[in-house]
């Protein structure tokens, strides 16, 4: 029995990619801890006041960079790990939302999805700048709530024979 409409399947697939050139570009962008941009020189002062730093300048353009937030850096590190492990179907961006139930509010944003030959990995990432203690009882409970529905959806799209594994990854939490 189909759980998703063709529109929902298309919406999920729009946030996934298996295009080698797109994956290579994404990998290069994600493996650096900095977000970089090329801007016109007349925009430079505004960006510098927002915490960006100037890397280089040419006649009309400036290259600037800013350290990515810790949560984005951690998600990027996990994404790159799966890419380095040979996974070639990965989420394109961090806007992948998967409907897991019948109600319209039964949707969950997924940080990293990696589809392999035999398995699909669904990763929820939590990171903090400074080491601190935390209990993730609420987050684990939420995963238990949507796990079965997300598994059904991913198997419907990528094949019933695939195993779906959930990972709760943390950085700087004890």
Language-model segments: residues:
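Intrinsically disordered, low-complexity Ser/Thr/Pro/Gly-rich regulatory segments
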Residues: 1-174
């Amino acid at each position: 029995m189909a759980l998703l409409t063709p529109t929902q399947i298309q919406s999920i697939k729009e946030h996934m990619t298996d295009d080698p050139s797109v994956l290579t570009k994404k990998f290069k962008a994600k493996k650096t801890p900095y977000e970089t941009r090329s801007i016109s020189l007349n925009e430079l002062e505004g960006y510098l006041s927002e915490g960006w730093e100037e890397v280089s300048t040419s006649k009309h353009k400036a290259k600037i960079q800013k350290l990515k937030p810790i949560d984005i850096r951690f998600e990027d590190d996990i994404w790159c790990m799966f890419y380095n492990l040979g996974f070639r179907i990965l989420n394109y961006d961090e806007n992948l939302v998967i409907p897991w139930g019948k109600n319209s509010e039964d949707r969950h944003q997924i940080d990293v999805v990696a589809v392999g030959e035999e398995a699909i990995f669904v990763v929820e990432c939590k990171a903090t700048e400074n080491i601190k203690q935390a209990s993730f009882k609420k987050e684990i409970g939420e995963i238990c709530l949507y796990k079965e529905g997300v598994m059904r959806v991913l198997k419907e799209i990528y094949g019933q024979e695939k195993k779906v594994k959930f990972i709760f990854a943390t950085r700087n939490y004890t």
